[in-house]
Amino acid sequence: MKDKILKDREEIEKFFIKLLGREIFISEMDIFASRCGCVGIMITVRGLFVDDVEIFKEKILNKLEELAKSYDINADWIFVRVLPGSDDIINIGVREFCNICREEYRFKKPRPDLISLKF
């Protein structure tokens, strides 16, 4: 499993570098399970901006959905986390909701530092 995670971290970094034509640094890619029952992927990134995600949204969504599927994770919610007061993206998240969070998030607006790409 660890070899797959290492390979996928490198692959997603190369994907963004090729897509944007500049250096993007993926320092960490985590596969997580929350206490509530949600599971997902959290990617820590440097060098990615809100404009990049808006321009290449469909390609990025396709890549993240493919990555999630390879870990048997349904991509219910795909989002980016922005450094407050800037256009710098610091995290990319893919989450499969548990039953509780699925209902809760239907009626909640995400925090101001989160931009939903797919919900």
From Swiss-Prot:
Note the superkingdom of the native organism. Answer: Archaea
Pfam family example for this protein?
A: DUF5402
InterPro entries from the entry?
Uncharacterised_MJ1658
Protein name per Swiss-Prot or TrEMBL: Uncharacterized protein MJ1658
Q: What is the lineage of its organism?
A: Archaea, Methanobacteriati, Methanobacteriota, Methanomada group, Methanococci
